[in-house]
């Protein structure tokens, strides 16, 4: 039996095409993936992300524990509500998962991890927490709705109470705040402004309906994938996994090397990889006809005339740009051109930073 979110019936009411997503019945689209994509880039769309795993880490050792668990450093979070993005690494510096951590108080952090990795993540966190004075509590009774797009905040404001709007007024990106029964965060997976709203399950359907009534377009997994790829955001299991270190996944910016005495899990292995040099994740742009796809080989020749090979990790047609884009893991000698093998012939592609669209505009 597949898991169903509390919003399952709301999806059916909007004629969603449901698919299995790592054991969850989730909407692929509600008729047109392209229209849903454009709604987020041009107006406002919303996603049911209630399958995500919310974990509260509470106790006197919460900060110390998360400083060991994560490659990024939660001690950098000084203002209540501030969040950071991090990899959670194994001893070999492989990425167990990528996640967001919110600093709420010195003894209370909220961590949001992926759904596909839930059991593995919870087991790892439980194992590593031994000896720390903390409690780790999963919050399955909470649903989550992401409202994204240039008009998302205004449309959400029409649904929030006056007190809730006052609580989040002027909130900067990458913050979260408890406002009444809602935990409202300025985070997302689309490259647009908006909120991710954690809501008690018994209020989720009413919130979804209220957003629908404000003209927020429901969006499925299809649009979520094209939006996140345009924004250059990794998908766990495709762009990185336990065989990949964060330096090879365009996540170097999420590693807090200082202070040098913070012994986070995987640090020694990661330092060795850094010193030896690793592959890197780049963006590819192909303006010819055709679509770049996961697992296609990428070829380039370095300055010495030696040919190297990499592989596409994620690829799609970009509805915003009108041509194909991809992320690829390649040796770090790559320049600004390469070739991709498609239908037994090689096609030229441009190599760019893995960030294609931000706030509705081309970003490279």
Curated annotation (Swiss-Prot):
InterPro entries according to UniProt: GCS_T, GCS_T_bac, GCST_C, GCV_T_N, GcvT/YgfZ/DmdA, GcvT/YgfZ_C, TrmE/GcvT_dom1
Keyword Transferase in record: yes
Listed GO MF terms: aminomethyltransferase activity; transaminase activity
Domain of life of the native organism: Bacteria
Keywords: Aminotransferase, Transferase
Annotated Gene Ontology cellular component terms: cytosol; glycine cleavage complex
EC number: 2.1.2.10
Keyword Metal-binding: no
Biological processes annotated in GO: glycine decarboxylation via glycine cleavage system
Reactions the enzyme catalyzes: N(6)-[(R)-S(8)-aminomethyldihydrolipoyl]-L-lysyl-[protein] + (6S)-5,6,7,8-tetrahydrofolate = N(6)-[(R)-dihydrolipoyl]-L-lysyl-[protein] + (6R)-5,10-methylene-5,6,7,8-tetrahydrofolate + NH4(+)
Similarity annotation: Belongs to the GcvT family.
Subunit structure: The glycine cleavage system is composed of four proteins: P, T, L and H.
Function: The glycine cleavage system catalyzes the degradation of glycine.
Name of this protein: Aminomethyltransferase
Organism whose genome encodes this protein: Shewanella sp. (strain W3-18-1)
